[in-house]
Design a protein with these regions (language model features):
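Conserved beta-strand scaffold positions in the cores of enzyme catalytic domains, especially
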Residues: 37-39, 86, 109
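His-Asp phosphorelay/catalytic-motif detector in bacterial-type signaling
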Residues: 55-57, 80-87, 111
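Hydrophobic/aromatic residues positioned on beta-strands within the core alpha/beta folds
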Residues: 89-91
Length: 139
């Protein structure tokens, strides 16, 4: 498990993904670590969730989110929330070079399938303020 939630509060994570199986795995893994995890199946819900939370500490977006692709969602949310930590889950076969050209430079790419351990490490690192560089997330 990742380190306990620091300081004064709960860490809030929004997961934007339409794959129910993947979402269940991600939510279960992150909740085991004490995080509060919200889920959005579509772009509108993701934008509303991030905007309505007192604080959103991390957005994890998949390749496919109903209404727009994950890259589009990230670009849209980054415009209104420039400091929001964001991770991208890739499962669509696009090359790293292609994704890196479309994503902000501080958005790491976590390729599916991935283990609970890799997800935990990525989340812990990003929640602690140490953003991995863009491209593949390397432990």
């Amino acid at each position: 498990m990742s380190s306990p939630v620091p300081g004064n509060g709960v860490r809030r994570i929004v997961v934007a993904d339409e794959d129910r199986g993947a979402v269940e795995f991600i939510i279960e893994t992150l909740r085991e670590d004490g995080h509060v995890v919200f889920h959005a199946y579509d772009v509108l819900a993701a934008v509303q969730l991030v905007g309505s939370l007192v604080s959103c500490d991390l957005l994890i977006s998949n390749t496919k989110v109903a209404g727009m692709d994950g890259v589009g969602l990230i670009v849209q949310l980054r415009a209104s929330h420039p400091t929001l930590p964001i991770a991208y889950l890739a499962n669509d076969g696009r090359s790293n070079a292609e994704l890196e050209s479309q994503l902000p430079s501080d958005v790491p790419i976590l390729r599916e399938p991935f283990t609970a351990q890799r997800l935990r490490r990525l989340a812990a690192r990003m929640l602690d303020g140490g953003r991995p560089a863009g491209g593949d997330f390397v432990e």
